[in-house]
Amino acid sequence: MLDLTELEKSLGVKFENLSLLEQALIHTSWVNENPNHLSGSNERMEFLGDAVLGVIFADRLYHDFPDIQEGDLTRFRSLLVRRESLVRVALGINLGKYLYLGRGEDASKGRFKPANLAGAFEAVLAAIYLDKGIDATREVIFRLFKTEMERVQTLSSNIDYKSRLQELVQAQFQLTPRYRIIDFSGPEHNHLFIAEVYTEDKVLAEGSGRSKKEAETSAAKEALQQFENSFTAEDNI
């Protein structure tokens, strides 16, 4: 059995049942060369880990972004659980070093193959879940995926507002909101743009940003806020 002490430290988890972590590291190629190994490969644990990862991120996104619709929540979750994200995290904890691989797979750089790393990482999450429960697994995921979660936070501030405003305005008034830059200031390399969103001859709101897109997004967000405030006021009458 490999010494998994350093891997436990990287994960921030001390296993009660270390055989779960070992099982998560066993690739099918190793099982094929060791037929007497009774517990099989990590594929079943990979299945469980994938589900655990998905539900933890779905829960986090649902509570962090109450105003964002299902389509964008799904896109955010896909960004978090995609193979590239899993591989980055797996490389960060040097997971490939600990994989049980068959000789041929090892010789063909199997310790660095994205599919092997992503699958093993999902299996490791399953091992943590089975050994420590959902709360401990959640803590590990949020710590290891900090970079990906920060990216989603940034994306959430720049998307959705324009499409949501368009849906609202079209539903309420059968009009399509448009955007225009009405002013800018500051040096050429660091302009501050002012945008307004309007329908026909009615200005709905203004917004500002360091790019035209950011200014338009800000205007859409402000317009949405005004609509929401007006709806709330009507409800209270």
Swiss-Prot record:
A GO cellular component annotation in the UniProt record: cytoplasm
Domain of life: Bacteria
Catalytically driven reaction(s): Endonucleolytic cleavage to 5'-phosphomonoester
Enzyme Commission identifier(s): 3.1.26.3
PROSITE patterns found in the cross-reference section: DS_RBD (PS50137), RNASE_3_1 (PS00517), RNASE_3_2 (PS50142)
Enzyme class (EC, first level): hydrolase
Protein name: Ribonuclease 3
Gene name for this UniProt entry: rnc
